[in-house]
Design a protein with these regions (language model features):
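Short, well-ordered coil/turn elements that cap or connect secondary structure elements
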Residues: 67-69, 97, 142
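Domain-level recognition of soluble alpha/beta enzyme cores
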Residues: 117-148, 153-156
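Active-site catalytic microenvironments for nucleophilic, acid-base chemistry
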Residues: 37, 62, 66, 93, ...
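Short, flexible active-site-adjacent loop segments at beta-strand->alpha-helix junctions, enriched
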Residues: 9-10, 54, 78, 106-108, ...
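Non-DNA-binding regulatory cores of transcription-related proteins
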Residues: 94-101, 106-131
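A polyampholytic, Gly/Pro-enriched intrinsically disordered region
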Residues: 92-102, 144-153
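Active-site-proximal alpha-helix that buttresses catalytic centers in soluble enzyme cores
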Residues: 2-82, 89, 123, 127-129
Length: 156
């Protein structure tokens, strides 16, 4: 399976709650850029799973509009603060897909990437807003992933 990790695009710093923080104009542009980059380069996930937090869901919707036949599902376990083991458990329900995109948060995605790569967290990179990281997995278990790429939106 090819697993794409997409950190949500830039969001406003303050709102009545963290769950309702929306994308800034720059964040909307970043999300469109990611979606176009995916389409242009054939990075087409079979399905997009997104955190229920507003900024992640907005990012996923925009990216999905840029990708042909992209379906996305709001996945409550992807909310900020998820644990890698919990994410793996949820991903097992989608293990029959060749590719999958998760849209979510930091430091959750760095923790998940480190867990899947079998790398200590201090040796893994920090995923920037609107960055796209791809991991190749032969199985959904710790330590078996291979990093394919990690690219920030400003380089897309």
């Amino acid at each position: 399976m090819l697993l794409y990790l997409l950190r949500h695009a830039e969001a406003v710093d303050h709102a009545e709650s963290d769950a309702v923080r929306e994308l800034t104009d720059k964040g909307v542009a970043q999300a469109h850029k990611v979606g176009k980059y995916c389409r242009k380069n054939g990075l087409i996930p079979a399905i997009i799973l997104t955190s229920p937090l507003k900024r992640a869901e907005q990012t996923a919707r925009i990216v999905a509009k840029e990708i042909p036949n992209a379906e996305f599902i709001v996945e409550p376990t992807l909310r900020a603060g998820m644990q890698p083991e919990t994410a793996l458990e949820e991903l097992r329900a989608f293990s029959n897909f060749k590719s999958l995109m998760l849209v979510g948060h930091e430091p959750d995605f760095s923790l998940l990437a480190a867990h899947l790569l079998g790398t200590p967290l201090r040796e893994i990179f920090h995923l920037r807003k609107a960055s796209l990281t791809a991991l190749e997995l032969d199985a959904l278990r710790p330590g078996v992933a291979t990093l394919q790429f990690s690219i920030p939106s400003k380089l897309m």
